[in-house]
UniProtKB/Swiss-Prot annotation:
Compartmental location: Cytoplasm
Gene name of the record: rimP
Protein name: Ribosome maturation factor RimP
Family named by the database record: Belongs to the RimP family.
UniProt main location, coarse: cytoplasm
Recorded GO CC terms: cytosol
Role, per record: Required for maturation of 30S ribosomal subunits.
Keyword terms of this UniProt record: Cytoplasm, Ribosome biogenesis
Length: 153
């Protein structure tokens, strides 16, 4: 369940990231820790996300959060990159990672196979399309449990 502060934090974080040329790809507020930890995952769409990107976002977002007082108590802000092994969810991510290697998991199995590895072609309303050694594989979306970027390991 999403913490009730995540939507207003998201509304604040997205424009801050956009001003820096970055994208917010995930926000989690861990309130089971003392102090609570606000974790923001970012991506630089122009190049590999680096430490400098995380530092710039951290400084800018910290100032914005402090100014709005969305989080009334002490907290720890962590800004990081989600890394290569991450799940594709939004249409924007499927467009951004076209041509990248992915692993598509299905349940129940599609054509007697539960995991498919190939180059991402696209996603439409009904299917995800991947290229597997020159052959286009069409996987019905209702069967897909997740699509992850694949790093070959």
């Amino acid at each position: 369940m999403t913490h009730p502060l995540v939507p207003p934090i998201t509304d604040l974080a997205i424009p801050v990231a956009e001003q820096l040329g970055l994208e917010v790809v995930g926000i989690v507020f861990h309130t089971n820790q003392r102090p609570p930890v606000l974790r923001i995952d970012i991506r630089n769409p122009q190049q590999d996300t680096g430490l400098d990107d995380c530092e710039r976002m951290s400084r800018a977002l910290e100032a914005a959060l402090d100014a709005t007082e969305i989080i009334p108590d002490a907290y720890v802000l962590e800004v990081s990159s989600p890394g290569i092994s991450r799940q594709l969810v939004t249409d924007r991510e499927f467009i951004s990672f076209k041509g990248f290697p992915v692993i598509v998991s299905t349940s129940p199995p599609h054509e007697e196979q539960q995991e498919w590895i190939g180059q991402l072609i696209r996603r439409d309303e009904t299917k995800v399309y991947i290229n597997q050694k020159g052959r286009v594989i069409e996987i019905p979306r209702p069967l897909i449990t997740r699509v992850l970027l694949y790093d070959g390991e």
